[in-house]
Amino acid sequence: MGKYFGTDGVRGEANVELTPELAFKLGRFGGYVLSQHETERPKVFVARDTRISGEMLESALIAGLLSVGIEVYKLGVLATPGVSYLVRTEKASAGVMISASHNPALDNGIKFFGNDGFKLADDQELEIEALLDAPEDTLPRPSAEGLGTLVDYPEGLRKYEKFLVTTGTDLSGMTVALDTANGAASVSARDVFLDLNAEIAVIGEKPNGLNINDGVGSTHPEQLQELVKETGADLGLAFDGDSDRLIAVDETGEIVDGDRIMFIIGKYLSEKGLLAHNTIVTTVMSNLGFHKALDKQGINKAITAVGDRYVVEEMRSSGYNLGGEQSGHVIIMDYNTTGDGQLTAIQLAKVMKETGKSLSELAAEVTIYPQKLVNIRVENSMKDRAMEVPAIANIIAKMEDEMAGNGRILVRPSGTEPLLRVMAEAPTDAEVDYYVDTIADVVRTEIGCDN
């Protein structure tokens, strides 16, 4: 990752780290880089989630885009995957989403999509960063008819909603509880599920600029669990702030995470011969129970580093059409180029409707192993070399021998902090505690910062 761009665009505390000045420059330089090869006036879609800082950053970003002659289509509040969809289908030069996803309201972010609807490649981000760090701005400054124009485009939301509905099936007789996280899905999820003829109950649908992801949404599903039980809903669906991820709740109030959602949809596609290469792409953090369920079903898996960016890269390079993360980012490439919480929710409900099975029945095929993750502060120079320390390598090997194939250990460095992450999965909580704590003690002794 670069100096400004992380794995999911540029992020920071709004008006402190991610300032209007930086947003203007990102619009100006990003717009220039992404439209250099256009033969006609470049067209860029811009959307945001419901954060109080969204309109401030949107105004600055759009000013930057207009300053290099871009025709800007202002979408207002819209889910991140909606931007990706519109860029592709309306043949835009690029798209920009202003959101910090599942982060709290004080944060915000800016991420770009190329004309293919995918997030930017590293070389494009580095080109933008080079312009940001240049001693002076030498880009063209058009005037009069050379300046960009701004078009309000509320039709974009309607087009995205119609697209979502076309991917589903009639949900008559099904009751769906929705948690739209006081975020981007609050403008669309209700309408989409009503159009699919579901009975609905909704929470997290009253954004005020400050309550996005606050006790609601995919990272806080507790209220949704209660709503499902209170209403007798067939399933609950929780989105995050920009609606690119989904966590579900079954009819008993139990959480159904990204691993189980991928398995349910993947098995359905596999049985219909529609799962490309009969493979699901997942990350190293997916639960061992998920892997065992895939093996039992005869479905292959491709494993990547943590981050939906890497999942998408593997899907594109190898021609896979389903992938995602335990956290609820699920990419269904037949329909869209990025994680799409509402799309995934519709596909999950479709599987339930077409199989006649409850969500708890479908999810029961994946036995989730207890998992524990411990972060250990270590010397930054050692976090990538931990396995070179004999005592650490030996204790990991010893624990894996004791597991005898009925558990999993993952030790990996943090990408952004001086931390070593120690994770284990095993059949019982007691076993997980034993494996993680034993390894963590050795790591602290050998390379921990407190020594």
From Swiss-Prot:
Keywords linked to the UniProt accession = Isomerase, Magnesium, Metal-binding, Phosphoprotein
Cofactor binding note from Swiss-Prot or TrEMBL: Binds 1 Mg(2+) ion per subunit.
Q: Where does the record place the catalytic residues?
A: 101
The cofactor required is: Mg(2+)
Q: List the EC numbers from the record.
A: 5.4.2.10
Q: Which positions bind Mg(2+)?
A: 101, 240, 242, 244
InterPro entries (alphabetical): A-D-PHexomutase_a/b/a-I, A-D-PHexomutase_a/b/a-I/II/III, A-D-PHexomutase_a/b/a-II, A-D-PHexomutase_a/b/a-III, A-D-PHexomutase_C, A-D-PHexomutase_C_sf, A-D-PHexomutase_CS, Alpha-D-phosphohexomutase_SF
Secretion signal span: none
Q: Is Isomerase there in the keyword field?
A: yes
- What's one GO-annotated cellular component? cytosol
Q: Which domain of life is it from?
A: Bacteria
Q: Which biological process annotations from GO are given for this protein?
A: carbohydrate metabolic process; peptidoglycan biosynthetic process; UDP-N-acetylglucosamine biosynthetic process
Q: Phosphoserine is carried by which residues?
A: 101
Q: Name one GO molecular function term.
A: phosphoglucosamine mutase activity
Going by the record, the broad EC class of this enzyme is isomerase
> Which reactions appear under catalytic activity for this entry?
alpha-D-glucosamine 1-phosphate = D-glucosamine 6-phosphate
Modifications the protein undergoes after translation, according to the UniProt entry: Activated by phosphorylation.
* CDD domains registered for this protein in UniProt: GlmM (cd05802)
Q: What does the record give as the function of this protein? A: Catalyzes the conversion of glucosamine-6-phosphate to glucosamine-1-phosphate.
Q: Say which family it is in.
A: Belongs to the phosphohexose mutase family.
Protein name per Swiss-Prot or TrEMBL: Phosphoglucosamine mutase
Ranked from the top, the taxonomy reads: Bacteria, Bacillati, Bacillota, Bacilli, Lactobacillales
